[in-house]
A protein has these predicted regions:
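PDZ/PDZ-like domain micro-motif
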Residues: 87, 141-142
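Conserved active-site alpha-helix within GNAT-family acetyltransferase domains
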Residues: 94, 118-135, 144-147
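Short hydrophobic/aromatic beta-strand or adjacent loop that forms the aromatic wall/cage
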Residues: 45, 148-154
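Acetyl-CoA-dependent GNAT
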Residues: 5-86, 94-99, 103
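Conserved GNAT acetyl-CoA-binding A-motif
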Residues: 104-115
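Conserved N-terminal entry element of GNAT/NAT acetyltransferase domains
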Residues: 1-9, 152, 156-158
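Active-site acidic-Proline motif in GNAT/NAT acetyltransferases
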Residues: 84-86, 90, 117-118
Length: 158
């Protein structure tokens, strides 16, 4: 497994991996109308992929928005973190988060993120890695079942 900066040619592989994650875990909660654009929205500052045997199997980005609103001055949000179900269990999620953490440290930015409260494996990962719970709120979007999930907000101390 290697982690490297994402390039435009990676997007098809990212979408393929994301589709597998969506089928397995329901992430993202609502499949984007244009997944290529969802992964490379104008607010994305930088993105990385995890690659195994020449295939994209993981992804993470940093974004100027969190939960649909601009981040505060001096912070940047982790977004679009996912790992293909067949590539899990080897530390790739942590390696992708390391890339984000290194970027934030070099840029002197605080990292923040939001995660739905029922994403227990993701929450466990963040808390194991030192992320601190800040607060929670109802999401400004609804799931396909009409429920507005609770989003937990975290920050990573510098």
């Amino acid at each position: 497994m290697i982690v490297r900066e994402r390039v435009d040619g990676d997007l098809d592989g990212c979408v393929d991996a994301l589709a597998q994650v969506h089928d397995c875990d329901g992430y993202p909660n609502m499949w984007p109308q244009n997944p290529h654009r969802w992964l490379s929205s104008p607010t994305v500052v930088k993105a990385w992929v995890g690659e195994s045997d020449g295939r994209v199997v993981g992804h993470v980005a940093v974004d100027r928005e969190v939960a649909g609103a601009p981040t505060t001055a001096g912070s940047i949000a982790v977004s679009r973190l996912f790992v293909h179900p067949h590539a899990r269990g080897n530390g790739l999620s942590g390696a992708l988060l390391d890339a984000v953490t290194d970027f934030a440290a070099e840029s002197q930015l605080e990292l923040v993120l939001d995660v739905v409260e029922d994403a227990l494996p993701a929450i466990a990962l963040y808390e194991r890695r030192g992320w601190v719970y800040v607060d929670e709120r109802l999401a400004d979007w609804t799931r396909t079942d009409g429920v507005r999930p609770v989003e937990r907000r975290y920050r990573l101390p510098r």
